[in-house]
From Swiss-Prot:
Family: Belongs to the SSH4 family.
Protein purpose: Components of the endosome-vacuole trafficking pathway that regulates nutrient transport. May be involved in processes which determine whether plasma membrane proteins are degraded or routed to the plasma membrane.
Residue spans, topological domain Lumenal: 98-494
Region annotation Disordered: where it falls in the sequence: 374-494
Composition-biased stretches (Polar residues): 426-435, 454-464
Protein name (Swiss-Prot/TrEMBL): Protein SSH4
Localisation: Vacuole membrane; Endosome membrane
Record domain B30.2/SPRY: where: 140-336
């Protein structure tokens, strides 16, 4: 029989030395078989004593071997699943990019929404819309389509130039005004921002685009007069744009219509957006250049954003209508109805310019440069004595009339003097008339002009009485300062 110590020693040795050979295993079974038979009836009443340290080490060794094997199996399974998942993802992307290209609507290269990438889908929608249009609408649409093909959006240079920037610095928000298209001539602009539309479809753009320096820019349009049959469209467009169409109907344009719909590059189907606006309402348009977001307001209440990501375009405020109406636009020259825009000063530019305008006429007394030019301009001009008296056979200087100074240019009416009797050809008075003419010419040569006396000498450099102006500057005089230096000196004196 084996004692407990022999059993522990044998198990420890087998674990350390590894798995024994088949012959060794059979001998072990024979040795332990008798032990199990001998101890079998005794185990019914046996209570195990406290586990020793060596037994704990054996149990830990057995658990560690089992855990390492499980971890290895788990790692292998996860690796296989990960590789399979990556392969499935790659195959899905290849299938999606290769076999579904024609059925997708993709944003353009800058991620801007509303651009039609699927030409077939757009052509299908266009064909369905043209069937429901009348002949006039079809003609207008085809005309606009031809205009856009000949003048693609953003094909013109619309950045603010240096001269426009200086005009904004000088005039402030007053630099913005609406310029109607002369070829259309279906609207009239008064006082720069008051637009009156007539009986056909027409749009009008501002002369300058919305700047991009500040965080938000905002402007408002008040509906002063609007019949129920007229449709008004207020929004933003780029140049060139077909102004015989309303904003929002074609690419790179967006608008809020009086029917409560919005249009964003959509000539066919409008989208319901907000409440309708009628006479007396105020519609505002806001633009965030940093995020390219456009939003609208109605009577001071902000509506949801319409578009995002429109950063690269230069947008022009645009108002259009298809019937008689009157719209007044506020670019910031007055207070806004939208309180947030009023407080944060979201106008297109300051109300007053920061650059002083040119000085008015007659205010050059304090300018050294202009005063010097005035002095030089007072130099009298002299002519030769040969030109002081002229004679022409067609001028009758000896005839009667009021005596005037050569410098008198008054427009007072002259007294009526009966002219001498005309002497016609083939009359008996022809010879007498010739003699009278010779006598008059002789008298003219003997008499000097009235109130005229030639000066004793004609100075070469010009002289007026006792005053004499030297046109040659004195080398001892200080140099004439430049314009900038003169302006700076004048400001310091003030």
């Amino acid at each position: 029989m084996f004692s407990r110590d022999d059993l522990v020693t044998t198990l420890t040795t087998s674990l350390i030395q590894g798995t024994p050979a088949p012959s060794s295993q059979s001998s072990i079974h024979r040795r332990f078989g008798s032990f199990q038979q001998a101890t079998e009836p005794v185990n019914h009443g046996y209570r195990p004593s406290r586990v020793s340290a060596s037994e704990k080490s054996i149990m830990f060794s057995l658990g560690g071997n089992v855990g390492s094997t499980g971890k290895g199996i788990l790692i292998g399974i996860l690796s296989a699943l990960g590789s399979a998942g990556i392969a499935i993802i790659v195959l899905s992307l290849v299938f999606f990019l290769r076999y579904t290209h024609r059925g997708r609507i993709i944003l353009d290269r800058l991620g801007r929404p509303g651009e039609y990438d699927d030409e077939q889908a757009f052509a299908r929608e266009e064909a369905e819309a043209l069937e429901s249009m009348d002949e006039l609408q079809q003609a207008e649409y085809m005309r606009a389509k031809a205009f856009i093909q000949a003048n693609p959006p953003e094909s013109a240079q619309t950045d603010i130039s240096l001269s426009q920037f200086l005009a904004i610095q000088e005039k402030g928000v007053s630099a913005w005004e609406f310029e109607p298209e002369l070829e259309i001539a279906n609207c009239f602009v008064e006082a720069r921002t008051e637009i009156e539309f007539f009986d056909s479809e027409c749009s009008v753009q501002s002369n300058l685009p919305v700047p991009k320096q500040n965080e938000v820019y905002y402007w408002e349009a008040k509906i002063y007069d609007k019949p129920e049959t007229s449709l008004i469209s207020i929004g933003m467009t780029t140049k060139p744009y077909p102004l015989f169409r309303l904003p929002g109907f074609h690419k790179t344009s967006i608008s809020y219509q009086s029917t409560g719909h919005r249009r964003h590059n959509q000539p066919f189907t409008p989208t319901l957006y907000g409440p309708e606006f009628v006479q007396g309402d105020v519609v505002g348009v806001g633009y965030r250049p940093r995020s390219g977001t456009i939003f609208f307001t109605r009577n001071g209440k902000k509506l949801e954003d319409v578009a995002h990501g429109l950063k690269s375009q230069n947008f022009f405020p645009t108002v259009g209508a298809n019937g008689p109406c009157t719209v007044h636009v506020n670019f910031g020259q007055l207070g806004f109805v939208f309180i947030e825009a009023n407080v944060k000063k979201w106008g297109l530019a300051p109300m007053t310019g920061s650059l002083a305008p040119p000085p008015p006429y007659g205010s050059e007394q304090g300018s050294i440069l202009l005063e010097t030019g005035r002095e030089n301009s007072q130099t009298p001009q002299w002519w030769g004595s040969a030109h002081s008296r002229t004679r022409s056979g067609t001028i009758r200087l000896g005839q009667g009339g009021p005596v005037r100074s050569p410098t008198d240019i008054s427009l007072a009416p002259l007294p009526h003097i009966s002219p001498p009797h005309d002497v016609g050809e083939g009359t008996s008075n022809s010879a007498q008339a010739g003699e009278n003419d010779s006598d008059v010419d002789a008298a003219i040569l003997d008499q000097p002009p009235p109130e005229y006396s030639s000066p004793a000498t004609s100075p070469p450099n010009g002289q007026s009485g006792d005053a004499r102006i030297d046109i040659h500057p004195d080398p001892n005089d200080p140099p004439i300062p430049s314009y900038d230096a003169a302006v700076l000196q004048q400001q310091q004196q003030v």
